Curated annotation (Swiss-Prot):
Pfam families on file: ATP-synt_ab, ATP-synt_ab_N, ATP-synt_VA_C
Protein name: ATP synthase subunit beta
Disordered as annotated region, ranges: 1-44
Keyword flag Glycosyltransferase: no
Native organism: Caulobacter vibrioides (strain ATCC 19089 / CIP 103742 / CB 15)
Length: 539
């Protein structure tokens, strides 16, 4: 059924095959089976199916080619006329599923052949199958109609709520804004998470990286940021799920409905009007082509809101490492020689093309929060290391801190921010943050002495430093709203002024009389005082 739309071009395309075979002996071997298979492939296509499958390929214009080689996620396509440009989308219909299948042209191989990357599974494709050039890169719907919906890398809805109602579309490959268009503001974005707001404050319109190994809390921290910022902020958000767990994507979709960030279409006659977040998923079960491009799809939606509607947009990407990983998967199939640790030689270029588009202009801003997986907890690995140069703030999640059950497991000594400057965040904030770092650094230096000689060998001054440092460590923990169902502890959103006041009191010694346990998993310092009183009453 699904072959009918391409039947007419296929018969026309096959005419020049005979003279070409004589001229190009190398291609003859590849084309002979294709020529033999083409009639067999055409037989099942009866006139009765002529009208049904036309929708997927409707409105396509451009050269027609045919598949000559299929190697997993990468295919070779031969064209008789003009070749499609690099990054152009070419389409066919998968005969096994009847679904539209999109490829992105990656290389021109010579002999009228291009090599392209598939955006979906290639099982069911056959050599000789016709392919059409769309004449442009992958185009996806953008605008208010995408809010509250989930789409895939090529802009198709995957939330079973019908087609996306949007008359506006954009291609996913675009140039970054020029220097003249870009703006650079230094305004603190309050997250409500104490350790982030104090030690590595985020900037509105900046790029933020959440670095961490497997299982240290990147996704949960990002979900809390979505909950705190997207709800309090009230603007538009875009979430790009790049190669992460489908379960987490599903949970996030329902959490957004429960927290009123998005509208439940089932309770609103199928409408998502009033929603404030668009979701774009290319999860870990997707082919590498989809995972390598889904971040660009999400970014295109965010760029529309920034450029055309003048909005300040939040862009969440989970996980930017999978974007790199997907590129590495197809790199060898494209014939590229791998670079360090097996990554693609174009790693820095691909990362730069993505990151340079995530910026603020004189029309609006994009504030980006990106989870970045760190393989084997090695921050010098080329994938996370390439991201560092593009970020305004880095929040490093530590396995050692997670092992102490301190969540979020942010390392206050490793995490940095470009706006950690008294001229931007204020003198008091800067002074308190640096004093907290000094206490923690002194404690870190004393740990070896404590391990060998014990606490008794420390001076009274050092004992005081250790006591305050341990209280600070525990006070940097915080109950999350998104983890309430697991911890049975209500989440806490702490205002920046309360965070600064609380830590100032600890380093000044105002709370030296409180036990360490009172500082664990609380919001502002008042909760720690109340917890200490409760502990004393129960003792």
């Amino acid at each position: 059924m699904a072959k009918t739309p391409a039947e007419k071009p296929a018969t026309a395309a096959k005419k020049p095959a005979a003279p070409k075979a004589a001229a190009a002996p190398k291609a003859a071997a590849a084309k002979a089976p294709a020529a033999a298979k083409a009639p067999a492939a055409k037989k099942p296509a009866a006139p009765k199916a002529a009208a049904a499958p036309k929708a997927p390929a409707a409105g396509l214009e451009g050269a027609t080619g045919r598949l000559v080689q299929i190697i997993g996620a990468v295919v070779d396509i031969e064209f008789d006329g003009a070749l499609p440009a690099i990054l152009n989308a070419v389409e066919t219909v998968n005969t096994a599923t009847g679904q539209r299948l999109v490829f992105e042209v990656a290389q021109h191989l010579g002999q009228s052949t291009v090599r392209a990357i598939a955006m979906d599974a290639t099982e069911g494709l056959v050599r000789g199958q016709p392919v059409r050039d769309t004449g442009e890169p992958i185009r996806v719907p953008v605008g208010p109609g995408t809010l509250g919906r989930i789409m895939n890398v090529i802009g198709e809805p995957i939330d079973e709520q019908g087609p996306i109602r949007s008359d506006i579309s954009r291609t996913i490959h675009r140039d970054a804004p020029s220097f003249a268009e870009q703006t650079n503001t230094a305004e603190v974005l309050v997250t409500g998470i104490k350790v982030i707001d104090l030690m590595c404050p985020y900037t509105k319109g900046g790029k933020i990286g959440l670095f961490g190994g497997a299982g240290v809390g990147k996704t949960v921290t990002m979900q809390e940021l979505i909950n705190n910022i997207a709800k309090a902020y009230g603007g538009y958000s875009v979430l790009a799920g790049v190669g992460e767990r489908t379960r987490e994507g599903n949970d996030l979709y329902h959490e957004m409905i429960e927290s009123n960030v998005n509208v439940d279409p089932k309770a609103n006659n199928g409408s998502t009007e009033g929603s404030r977040c668009a979701l774009v998923y290319g999860q870990m079960n997707e082919p590498p082509g989809a995972r390598a491009r889904v971040a660009l799809t999400g970014l295109s939606i965010a760029e529309y809101f920034r450029d055309e509607e003048g909005k300040d947009v939040l862009l969440f990407v989970d996980n930017i490492f999978r974007f790199t990983q997907a590129g590495a998967e197809v790199s060898a199939l494209l014939g590229r020689i791998p670079s360090a640790v097996g990554y693609q030689p174009t790693l820095a270029t691909e990362m730069g093309n993505l990151q340079e588009r995530i910026t603020s202009t004189n029309k609006g801003s994009i504030t980006s929060v990106q989870a970045i997986y760190v393989p084997a907890d090695d921050l010098t690995d080329p994938a996370p290391a390439t991201s560092f140069a593009h970020l305004d703030a880095t929040t490093v999640l530590s396995r050692d801190i997670a092992a102490q059950a301190i969540f979020p497991a942010v390392d206050p000594l490793d995490s940095t921010s470009r706006i950690m400057d008294p001229l931007v965040i204020g003198e008091e904030h800067y002074t308190v943050a640096r004093r907290v770092q000094e206490v923690l650094q002194q404690y870190k230096a004393l740990k070896d002495i404590i391990a060998i000689l014990g606490m008794d060998e420390l001076s009274e001054e050092d004992k005081l430093v250790v006591a305050r440092a341990r209280k600070i460590q525990r006070f940097l923990s915080q109950p999350f709203h998104v983890a309430e169902q697991f911890t049975n502890t209500p989440g806490a959103f702490v205002q920046l002024k309360d965070t600064i006041r609380s830590f100032k009191g600890i380093v000044d010694g105002e709370y030296d009389h409180l036990p360490e346990g009172a500082f664990y998993m609380v919001g502002p310092i008042e909760e720690a005082v109340a917890k200490a009183e409760k502990m004393a009453a129960e003792a």
